[in-house]
């Protein structure tokens, strides 16, 4: 370990060596000179001595004593009633005694006797905190000051170093030149001494050369001096610039704080100078502006006189400040009289602020007053009218006021406001009426940006892709069972009621290749689903049951396939049944223009059985053969393009869409656009629910991450960035909304009479929530078909997803019934529906929903009134009773007659009166009913012309409930 001397320790402690030696001797450490070595034990003894000397040993002693004194006093105080009461007041006083050091004890006692403050612990802590803050502030200020001083010293040192370096370089150059000259002189003398016979001319040349070199050395020294002066000049210039910048900032601050000055034009300045010249030699004293201070005027010198006096007869200038050709210029602060405010052009020239096209009669500035002006023609503008435009925008395009457009619309018989939206046809009529040329505008369509993406897909290299096969046919003909056998899975058992209510998309890997199947519903309500399936498919498998034959949905499937232009492969199912008749099926299909190959047509017919598997291989072989003929190809290494087969809203996952990729490759993370929905693919699942990273052509996948539920059948495109997708989606939403709004406004007047005639029509409001969009479309379509002239179905709202509280609130406002198709209401919605008495009905089979709605509509129909003859009565004798009228004595020939029954009077088998019985008696007693074979007396209300031989037909009207 390195030894430490007394001098080194004194240097570390910033003390003198002699003082440290004295302290060491006082501590009992014998050291005589600063060079003596100090050990660690010596340092420890010195430290103990210093602690004892400065009182640190007494730190543990108690230095502060707190004394609390309690004083009680009484005061007398009057209360609200005027009585005087004695109130005891207790005051607590706290004193803190602090034990100080001995030298300061007397001073502390004197201060305590003078002030005797009461200081508590909080006050002490606050004061200590304040002292600490002040110390930190002082330390921070000292550090900043020290840093500035160090920076200035460093800058000065650098400047001195540069100057010294320049001087050293100059000196070195001079010394080098002198040394070289001296060496050459010595060499010359040595050469002269060595050879005395050298010519004198050589010596003179050497001398001249030495002189030249001496001059060069002097020149180098001068250049070094000039460089040093240049550095110094640059430093001076930098200092001056800094001072100038500071002065400018100071001037700007003074200017900002100074009162504002009035800027005047040259015309005003000339007028004031003329007035000043007129007042010279008089006793008039110029009035100083109100806002100007005397010191400011004294400091600022007056402006110089103008270079030339104004011409004779020239105007004095506009006192109010004209807007002349020259810009504003700063005026001095000399006191000048302000101009009088006058009416008219005081300047008389063209620069006055009141000068215009209709100047005064003494005005001479307008040289073109009598010049020829060509007549103005109406400007015919070419107005580009978009699909929808507001009245204000249309007026702006024609450069007219909106009021003019509104007047023109009123002339055309339509009341509009400035913000009302007009459709394209109406707007073009208005433009033509106002004398302009209307052109249907081509919108700044963001969808035009999609052309490049589609072109990129078209230019990509195409590869062979699997065929997309759609299975179509009538309900219960075995489509799903056939596909189930091919897939080796149980799908039909999972569908409610054993019927397919969704489009199922699957791809199957067979020994002969990959095939993608689309299973479509066969029920008549799912027409839109079958149309979408035919649109996305390459080949259609038409399933016809051998025991049932061609049915309505079979014909519809044939029509869809022909409209899509895709080949058909007929699969005759259920051939294993005893009552199967494939030949009858062929004959019926021939009637529908589906000709089998054995009859000379081009449609293969394959008898199959989904139970035994008979004909399945032959069916797949025919499908792949058709695919080879079609030569199906699609680009793979390109942005994906596809079709939304089905879409739904999941409570946890959000909008979900089943997409069939038609070309390109869809990857997780791609930005997709589907109609008015857009988003980034967050997750992608195959038909088995397993995650998939990508999907090539003809592969169906389920994607998540869209902004909303897309419409089934929408085209799906992959775009390079989300901004473009959002822009196109919002454009589509706005376009559809504007067009719909404009059409609704145009159709209001046309529908008014129709709505008035429908005032007596009853309506059944419904809110429909389904699991997928295809089912929702089918259910809405089926229910709307139930509407009649008397009762119609009103679909208030139809959407995908569970039943929420907002649906219940909507049902409460519209008095609607909520139908949930494969969906359920959450707890909040159920409670709210129960409180408001809203009927929520759940279904999972479309037949049941349609039947119950049909029954409800039947109950809303007004009952049918039917007449039923109950009896026939013959008049045998007529009695005329005073105050009663004619009374007929009758015999009941058939049926019975009741009191107050409806009757028709028949005379010669012709109805002459229809009315109601007034009374019915047997003998003298009133009776309720008289049956066949008995006599009775009766009178008819408001009819006295009863004759013998008349017949009375008794009937009653019954109401019968009607059904749809």
Curated annotation (Swiss-Prot):
G2 as annotated region, ranges: 498-502
Region: G5, residue numbers: 609-611
Region (G3): 519-522
Annotated binding of GTP, by residue: 473-480, 519-523, 573-576
InterPro entries assigned: DNA-bd_dom_put_sf, EF-G-like_DII, EFTu-like_2, IF2_assoc_dom_bac, IF2_II, IF2_N, P-loop_NTPase, Small_GTP-bd
Region (G1): 473-480
Residues covered by region (G4): 573-576
Cellular compartment(s): Cytoplasm
Domain of life: Bacteria
Region (Disordered): 105-133, 146-378
GO molecular function list: GTP binding; GTPase activity; guanosine tetraphosphate binding; translation initiation factor activity
Domain (tr-type G) ranges: 464-633
Transmembrane segments: none
This protein's record includes keyword Chaperone: no
Biased composition (Low complexity): 105-119, 288-302
Ranges annotated as biased composition (Pro residues): 303-313
Assigned keywords, A-Z: Cytoplasm, GTP-binding, Initiation factor, Nucleotide-binding, Protein biosynthesis
GO cellular component, one term: cytosol
Signal peptide: none
Comp. bias intervals (Basic and acidic residues): 123-133, 146-183, 197-253, 266-278
UniProt record similarity statement: Belongs to the TRAFAC class translation factor GTPase superfamily. Classic translation factor GTPase family. IF-2 subfamily.
PANTHER family according to UniProt: TR-TYPE G DOMAIN-CONTAINING PROTEIN, TRANSLATION INITIATION FACTOR IF-2-RELATED
Function: One of the essential components for the initiation of protein synthesis. Protects formylmethionyl-tRNA from spontaneous hydrolysis and promotes its binding to the 30S ribosomal subunits. Also involved in the hydrolysis of GTP during the formation of the 70S ribosomal complex.
Protein name in the entry: Translation initiation factor IF-2
Species for this entry: Ralstonia pickettii (strain 12J)
Name of the coding gene: infB
């Amino acid at each position: 370990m390195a030894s430490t001397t007394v001098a080194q320790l004194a240097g570390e402690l910033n003390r003198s060596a002699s003082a440290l030696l004295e302290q060491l001797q006082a501590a009992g450490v014998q050291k005589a000179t600063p060079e003596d070595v100090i050990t660690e034990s010596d340092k420890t003894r010195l430290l103990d001595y210093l602690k004892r000397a400065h009182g640190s040993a007494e730190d543990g002693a108690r230095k502060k004593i707190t004394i609390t004194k309690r004083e009680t006093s009484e005061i007398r105080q009057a209360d609200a009633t005027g009585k005087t009461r004695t109130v005891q007041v207790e005051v607590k006083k706290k004193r803190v005694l602090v034990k100080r050091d001995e030298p300061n004890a007397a001073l502390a006692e004197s201060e305590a006797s003078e002030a005797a403050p009461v200081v508590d612990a909080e006050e002490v802590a606050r004061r200590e905190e304040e002292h600490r803050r002040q110390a930190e502030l002082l330390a921070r200020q000292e550090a900043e000051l020290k840093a500035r001083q160090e920076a200035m010293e460093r800058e000065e040192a650098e400047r001195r170093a540069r100057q010294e370096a320049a001087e050293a370089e100059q000196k070195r150059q001079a010394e080098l030149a002198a040394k070289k000259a001296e060496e050459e002189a010595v060499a010359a003398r040595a050469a002269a001494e060595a050879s005395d016979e050298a010519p004198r001319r050589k010596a003179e040349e050497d001398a001249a050369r030495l002189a030249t070199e001496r001059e060069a050395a002097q020149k180098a020294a001068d250049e070094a001096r000039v460089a040093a002066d240049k550095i110094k000049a640059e430093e001076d210039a930098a200092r001056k610039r800094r001072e100038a910048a500071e002065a400018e900032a100071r001037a700007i601050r003074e200017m900002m704080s100074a009162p504002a000055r009035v800027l005047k034009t040259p015309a005003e300045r000339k007028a004031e100078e003329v007035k000043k010249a007129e007042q010279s030699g008089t006793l008039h004293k110029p009035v100083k502006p109100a806002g100007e201070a005397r010191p400011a005027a004294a400091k600022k010198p007056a402006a110089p006189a103008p270079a030339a006096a104004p011409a004779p007869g020239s105007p004095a200038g506009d006192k109010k400040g004209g807007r002349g050709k020259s810009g504003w210029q700063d005026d001095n602060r000399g006191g000048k009289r302000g101009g009088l405010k006058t009416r008219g052009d005081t300047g008389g020239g063209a620069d006055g602020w009141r000068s215009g096209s209709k100047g005064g009669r003494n005005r001479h500035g307008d040289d073109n007053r009598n010049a020829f002006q060509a007549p103005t023609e109406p400007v015919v503008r070419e107005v580009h009218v978009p699909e929808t435009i507001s009245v204000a925008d249309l007026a702006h395009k024609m450069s007219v006021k909106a009021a003019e457009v509104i007047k023109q619309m009123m002339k055309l018989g339509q009341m509009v406001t400035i913000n009302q939206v007009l459709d394209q046809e109406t707007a073009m009529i208005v433009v033509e009426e106002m004398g302009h040329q209307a052109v249907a505008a081509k919108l700044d369509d963001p969808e035009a940006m999609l052309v490049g993406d589609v072109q990129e897909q078209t230019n990509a290299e195409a590869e062979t892709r699997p065929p997309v096969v759609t299975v179509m046919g009538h309900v219960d003909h075995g489509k799903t069972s056939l596909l189930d056998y091919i897939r080796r899975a149980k799908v039909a058992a999972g569908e409610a009621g054993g019927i397919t209510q969704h489009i199922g998309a699957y791809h199957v890997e067979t020994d002969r290749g990959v095939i993608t199947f689309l299973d479509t519903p066969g029920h008549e309500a799912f027409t839109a689903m079958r149309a979408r399936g035919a649109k996305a498919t390459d080949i259609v498998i038409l399933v016809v049951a051998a025991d049932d034959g061609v049915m309505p949905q079979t014909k519809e499937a044939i029509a869809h396939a022909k409209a899509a232009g895709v080949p058909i492969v007929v699969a005759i199912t259920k051939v294993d049944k005893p009552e199967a008749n494939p030949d009858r099926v062929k004959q019926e299909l021939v009637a529908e223009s589906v000709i089998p190959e054995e009859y000379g047509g081009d449609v293969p017919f394959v008898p199959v059985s989904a139970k035994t598997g008979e004909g399945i291989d032959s069916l797949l072989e025919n499908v792949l053969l058709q695919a080879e003929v079609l030569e199906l190809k699609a680009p793979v290494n390109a942005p994906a393009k596809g079709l939304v087969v089905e879409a739904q809203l999941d409570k946890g996952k959000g909008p979900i869409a089943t997409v069939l990729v038609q070309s390109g490759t869809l990857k997780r993370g791609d930005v997709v656009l589907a109609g008015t929905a857009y988003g980034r693919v967050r997750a992608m699942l195959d038909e088995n629910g397993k995650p998939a990273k990508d999907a090539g052509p003809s592969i169906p996948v389920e994607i998540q991450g869209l902004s909303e539920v897309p419409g089934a059948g929408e085209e799906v495109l992959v775009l390079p960035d989300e901004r473009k997708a959002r822009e196109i989606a919002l454009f589509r939403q706005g376009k559809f909304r504007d067009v719909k709004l404009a059409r609704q406004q145009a159709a209001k007047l046309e529908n008014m009479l129709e709505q008035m005639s429908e005032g007596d029509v009853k309506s059944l409001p419904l809110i429909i929530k389904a699991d997928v969009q295809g089912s929702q479309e089918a259910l809405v379509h089926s229910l709307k078909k139930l509407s009649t002239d008397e009762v119609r179905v009103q679909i208030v709202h139809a959407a995908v997803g569970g039943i929420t509280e907002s649906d219940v609130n909507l049902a409460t406002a519209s008095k609607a019934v909520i139908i949930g198709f494969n969906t359920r209401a959450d707890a909040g919605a159920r409670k709210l529906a129960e409180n408001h008495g809203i009927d929520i009905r759940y279904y999972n089979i479309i037949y049941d929903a349609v039947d119950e709605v049909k029954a409800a509509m039947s109950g809303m129909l007004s009952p049918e009134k039917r007449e039923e003859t109950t009896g026939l009565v013959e008049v045998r004798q007529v009695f005329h009773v005073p105050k009663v009228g004619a009374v007929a004595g009758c015999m009941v020939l058939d049926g019975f007659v009741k009191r107050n029954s409806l009757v028709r009077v028949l005379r010669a088998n012709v109805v002459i009166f229809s009315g109601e019985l007034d009374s019915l008696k047997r003998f003298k007693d009133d009776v309720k009913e008289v049956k066949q074979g008995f006599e009775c007396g009766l009178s008819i209300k408001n009819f006295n012309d009863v004759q013998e031989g008349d017949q009375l037909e008794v009937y009653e009207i019954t109401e019968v409930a009607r059904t749809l």
